[in-house]
Amino acid sequence: MDSLSQYKVLSAPGTVHYLPNFITEAEETSLLAQVARTPSPRWTQLANRRLQNWGGLPHPKGMIAEKMPDWLQTYVNMVNNLGVFGAKEGVDGIKPTLANHVLLNEYHPGQGIMPHLDGPMFHPTISTISLGSHTVINFYKEEGENSSLKFEDRLVTSLLVEPRSLLVLQDEMYHQLLHGIEEIHEDKIDDKICNLDNSTVIGSIIPRKTRISLTIRHVPKTSKMKLKLGR
């Protein structure tokens, strides 16, 4: 994690590391081509986006581990090498905790995801590589006693996530703040975005394109045996 210190977003309310140009344009092009070649049965279609699970399908009873394809494992290794998932002690001594799951989401302009917490099935670190387009991720307080407040009234901060970047969220950014993406076609840059650089102009409008996100995570509870998940 020491190598990440220069990428920490100091104005964020929790632990955020943002690495622009984590991958090259050539790597992005290769990944997008690989995603485009994915057979249609691999996709799960939802109302507002479609997705793929790689490494297994997370479940409260345990994820049945599957081999990660080589075209994804390369980038899983790149994230693992940063040490973002920490380490744990076992019978063979202290070993790094490694990512074993990738959730691939496809968002067209106008699509997004409702504010949510990722929950206890995952190690409390989210690492996401973005391909093809930027997005803005918003972070909100949970309802608490003020359940009548709309999401916009509970907005804490936002992050501008650019193509080819890596975003790492930890601690209260994982446990306490809901994160979501608005279902809009363009993003207006405002002072709620906490990771703006000097080249970004407040008030500018950025049209969205189709975005692929690779959310790389560690699922602690896994099984090599098929589970009887029930109906």
Question: Which ranges hold each PLM region?
Answer:
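Non-heme Fe(II) oxygenase metal-center motifs and adjacent flexible, charged/small-residue loops
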Residues: M1-R231
